[in-house]
Swiss-Prot record:
Predominant cellular place of this UniProt entry's protein: cytoplasm
A matching Pfam family: DAP_epimerase
Cell location: Cytoplasm
MF annotations from Gene Ontology: diaminopimelate epimerase activity
GO terms for cellular component: cytosol
Species in which this protein is naturally found: Magnetococcus marinus (strain ATCC BAA-1437 / JCM 17883 / MC-1)
Name of the molecule in the record: Diaminopimelate epimerase
Chain sites annotated for binding substrate: 13, 46, 65, 75-76, 157, 190, 208-209, 218-219
Gene that encodes it: dapF
Length: 278
């Protein structure tokens, strides 16, 4: 018997989902890299492992980047997991899913409308974390001989948001890895460039930590929207336009951030066998 998997995506941000709810086991960084490899494995932006909840949640979600490192949270993956647990596992439409960033609560209305309470943004430098105290709001960051004005925050994982005049023309493949590995960010960082289109609409592109450029990032969309909202550039209910589609982000007066968007199951399969050593 091989290893069964489900291929899903949220706005083109694709995942290999491993359902280990009934047979929990550890997933090594080497195995995660294999699953994510688009030539030798199945291929994905991130590997998502589902395990039994240990803190009262319906399930536990572990996220692995293509380089084998762990990610604290992924909004697009959370929508996919919510849809899978509800439609295929028969769980309630309102779920509690444990992550390294805490318990997240997806609410499934349909495959086109999954809303996730993403929690509260964290602005303190040590909470993101940054290698400095205090907040980083529209502050200069020197990268590759250029200066960018960055707002840093955590949405359960670290994000750096820079406003640009032209998101499409920004050299994200060049600047992204330099920002990710900047000395200011001890745990590395996800990097978003954002162009304000109107008071209710922004264009965002993302360089994900450990994954590179991806079509969409749920936590990144939340971070970009909230960074713009805090500085008064947009309203507190905003559409984020990503390479893969659109997400709706609302920053409530309670300080909680709500993300709404679709999730899609693409196919299911069975890996005949892992290479020796896994």
């Amino acid at each position: 018997m091989g290893e069964r998997f489900i291929k899903m995506h949220g706005l083109g941000n694709d995942f290999v989902v491993l359902d280990h709810l009934e047979s929990p086991r550890e997933l090594s960084p080497q195995e995660a890299r294999f699953w994510a490899d688009r030539r030798r494995g199945v291929g994905c932006d991130q590997v998502v492992q589902l395990l039994p909840g240990v803190e009262g949640g319906d399930a536990q979600m572990r996220i692995y980047n293509p380089d084998g490192s762990r990610a604290e949270m992924c909004g697009n993956a959370m929508r996919c997991v919510g849809l899978y647990l509800h439609e295929q596992r028969g769980m309630a439409a309102a779920l509690a899913v444990e992550t390294l960033a805490g318990i997240m609560r997806p609410q499934v209305t349909s495959a086109l409308a999954i809303t996730v309470d993403m929690g509260r943004p964290q602005w303190a430098g040590r909470a993101i974390p940054l290698d400095q105290d205090g907040e980083m709001i529209d502050a200069p960051l020197e990268v590759g001989g250029q200066s960018y004005r960055m707002t840093a925050l955590s949405m359960g994982n670290p994000h750096g948001v820079v406003r640009v005049a032209d998101a499409e023309g920004f050299e994200l493949a060049k600047v992204g890895p330099l920002v990710e590995h900047h000395a200011l960010f001890p745990n590395r960082i996800n990097f978003e460039v954002v162009q304000v289109l109107s008071r209710s609409r922004i264009r965002m592109r993302v360089w994900e930590r450990g994954a590179g450029i991806t079509p969409a990032c749920g936590t990144g969309a939340c971070a970009a929207a909230v960074a713009c909202m805090r500085q008064g550039w947009v309203e507190r209910d905003c559409t984020v336009v990503l390479d893969g589609g659109e997400l709706q982000i609302v920053w409530l007066e309670s300080d909680r951030v709500m993300m709404s968007g679709p999730a899609t199951e693409v196919f299911r399969g069975e890996l005949v066998g892992l290479p020796a050593g896994f």
